């Protein structure tokens, strides 16, 4: 296959953003069971790789804490114990490192394994799914221009802007709140 046929969907680089890993199962189920013509076309013309948890140790730490401290009915008080995850929380990996900061240095086993697979598969599209807090609206790129890494190719920035425009139009159509900076 050509690399243009490959899509990589990665969820939960921050272990305490559990919506991503949970959603990955639903995405896989949808792709496997949908009879929608558009979905069938995707599957006919592309390989979709799903990595359900980029940070399994952080996710396990968070799940253990959440199962001990959160109830079935959420508590509105922001000072309630269910809203205050202790350190080390689920964000970092086993070594208490934020794997979202390890894409270039590749110091950790999860990152090295992920990049080895990137080099093997060479995906054309990479989805890196995060979760916002319960009191936040949605964020999507391109974000603040001064935070753009100087060696990021212009074509990447242009594609990111097109994707952002697509999301903005969809959110505007539904009246959903979001921010990009």
Language model regions located:
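Short helix-loop-beta-strand segments that form the rim/entrance of peptidase-like active sites
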Residues: 23-67
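Short, small-residue-biased leader/transition segments that mark boundaries at the very start
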Residues: 2-3
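Metallocarboxypeptidase
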Residues: 49, 63-64, 68-181
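Short glycine-rich or small-residue beta-strand-to-loop segments that form or flank ligand, phosphate
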Residues: 7-11, 98-100
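Short alpha-helical patches at coil-to-helix transitions and adjacent helical residues
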Residues: 17, 21-25, 111
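Conserved hydrophobic helix-helix packing surfaces used for dimerization/oligomerization
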Residues: 6-7, 48
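Solvent-exposed loop/turn segments at secondary-structure junctions
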Residues: 13-18, 54-59, 104-106, 131-135
């Amino acid at each position: 296959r050509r690399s243009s046929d490959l899509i990589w969907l990665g969820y939960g680089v921050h272990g305490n953003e559990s919506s991503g890993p949970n959603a990955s199962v639903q995405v896989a189920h949808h792709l496997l069971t949908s009879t929608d013509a558009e979905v069938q076309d995707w599957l006919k013309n592309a390989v979709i790789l799903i990595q359900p948890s980029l940070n399994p140790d952080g996710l396990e730490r968070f799940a253990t804490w959440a199962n001990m401290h959160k109830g079935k009915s959420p508590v509105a008080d922001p000072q309630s114990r269910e809203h205050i995850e202790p350190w080390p929380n689920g964000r970092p990996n086993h070594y208490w490192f934020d794997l979202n900061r390890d894409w270039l240095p590749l110091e950790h086993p999860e990152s090295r394994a992920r990049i080895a697979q990137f080099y093997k598969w060479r995906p054309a599209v990479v989805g890196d799914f995060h979760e916002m807090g319960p009191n936040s609206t949605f964020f999507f790129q391109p974000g603040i221009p001064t935070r753009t890494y100087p060696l990021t190719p212009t074509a990447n920035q242009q594609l990111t802007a097109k994707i952002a425009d697509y999301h903005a139009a969809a959110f505007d159509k539904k009246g959903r709140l979001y921010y990009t900076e």
